[in-house]
Amino acid sequence: MDPYKVIIRPVITDKAISLIEKENKLTFIVDRRATKQDIKRAIEEIFNVKVEKVNTLITPKGEKKAYVKLKPEYSASEIAARLGLF
């Protein structure tokens, strides 16, 4: 699956910003057909970082949300700044 089709958009909520600052996690809405491996590969390729783990859930709206924890040597705050979240 094309990495740019896997990631639909970042999530910008108070909880998502808190996760960026406290747990080094980014939150994205992703394609519903994407697997955790697809999401990990897409994030690593697009943002040039290493991913520690990916947690996913389906929202009541029917969207798939992914919580992506980066390895400690990478900063979620820097990625968020590049995305224009800060």
From Swiss-Prot:
Pfam families (alphabetical): Ribosomal_L23
Disulfide pairings: none
InterPro entries assigned: Nucleotide-bd_a/b_plait_sf, Ribosomal_uL23, Ribosomal_uL23-like, Ribosomal_uL23/eL15/eS24_sf, Ribosomal_uL23_CS
Biological process terms in GO annotation: translation
Cellular component, GO, one term: ribonucleoprotein complex
Annotated GO MF terms: rRNA binding; structural constituent of ribosome
Family membership noted in the UniProt record: Belongs to the universal ribosomal protein uL23 family.
Primary role: Binds to 23S rRNA. One of the proteins that surrounds the polypeptide exit tunnel on the outside of the ribosome.
Entry protein name: Large ribosomal subunit protein uL23
Species of origin: Pyrococcus abyssi (strain GE5 / Orsay)
